[in-house]
Amino acid sequence: MSKIPSVNIKALLDAGVHFGHKTSRWNPKMASYIYGKRDDVHIIDLRQSVALMNVALNAIYETVKKDGKILFVSTKIQASDIIAEYAEKCGQYYVNHRWLGGMLTNWKTIAGSIEKLNKLDKTLENEEALMGYTKKEILDMSRKKDKLLLSLAGIRNLNSKPDLLVVIDTNKEHIAINEAVKLNVPIVAVVDTNSNPDNVDYPIPGNDDSIRSIRLYCSLFADAALQGLEESMKASGVDMGAMQEHTDKGLTSKNVSKLKQAKKFSKTKNIDEETNTEFEQVLNDADENKNSDNA
């Protein structure tokens, strides 16, 4: 049986997941996820981050296991390359530059743009066909292709709406979230102390600005998706030796089943004692180290 990845408080702390924004920038709707404040910066309750991350990872795993498609979204500079790297690693889809309005709700128009991109690709790869164009025309086509690739590279093989949206920075990606809500697409999202968690089905309280934090999230998301892919392939009788090839190409199964939307989590009520003790200990250790440095 595949093992869904999990995370502990120490790993989150090392990645700086506990650092929120300045207290003056907070969103009161995040109050239940905040542990306290230090030096006018909110500290995120990593006990809840651990529990809710594990719930989100299970949602990702189950979606891919059922041949569902996941769309990773983050267009902020520090997340752009990381999102693409890990989405490609697990054979899923991504938007990492500009979210075009209607990417989900006006799919017909987006599909037309993808078709245009594919035609430009074919033309530019056909040396014989290019003989009929001037250098300026070829340059114009190359520029159009590059512009389309920026927005569509990660979804050019996506032929229908995704079954799950994974977002880093809900404020920046509010249009994507609104479109997903309209289409009843469940949402996994990292929610920082200035975020609104209302429309997020699987919130993960955490720092959404740190590169180390973002890389940790994406690594866990990709691993969960890969485990789901492995289970899906086993169920389909696919040779597991060919798994890497399938992962590189992305999911191509036409037998897509939508993940049933799970009950929405507003906060975690049952945090086990071991996790609680670990959180208190790592915070105390951090304080001791800080005091030692300032001595």
From Swiss-Prot:
<dbReference type="InterPro" id="IPR018130">
    <property type="entry name" value="Ribosomal_uS2_CS"/>
</dbReference>
<dbReference type="GO" id="GO:0022627">
    <property type="term" value="C:cytosolic small ribosomal subunit"/>
</dbReference>
<comment type="similarity">
    <text>Belongs to the universal ribosomal protein uS2 family.</text>
</comment>
<keyword id="KW-0689">Ribosomal protein</keyword>
<dbReference type="InterPro" id="IPR023591">
    <property type="entry name" value="Ribosomal_uS2_flav_dom_sf"/>
</dbReference>
<dbReference type="Pfam" id="PF00318">
    <property type="entry name" value="Ribosomal_S2"/>
</dbReference>
<dbReference type="InterPro" id="IPR005706">
    <property type="entry name" value="Ribosomal_uS2_bac/mit/plastid"/>
</dbReference>
<protein>
    <recommendedName>
        <fullName>Small ribosomal subunit protein uS2</fullName>
    </recommendedName>
</protein>
<feature type="region of interest" description="Disordered">
    <location>
        <begin position="261"/>
        <end position="295"/>
    </location>
</feature>
<dbReference type="GO" id="GO:0006412">
    <property type="term" value="P:translation"/>
</dbReference>
<keyword id="KW-0687">Ribonucleoprotein</keyword>
<dbReference type="InterPro" id="IPR001865">
    <property type="entry name" value="Ribosomal_uS2"/>
</dbReference>
<dbReference type="GO" id="GO:0003735">
    <property type="term" value="F:structural constituent of ribosome"/>
</dbReference>
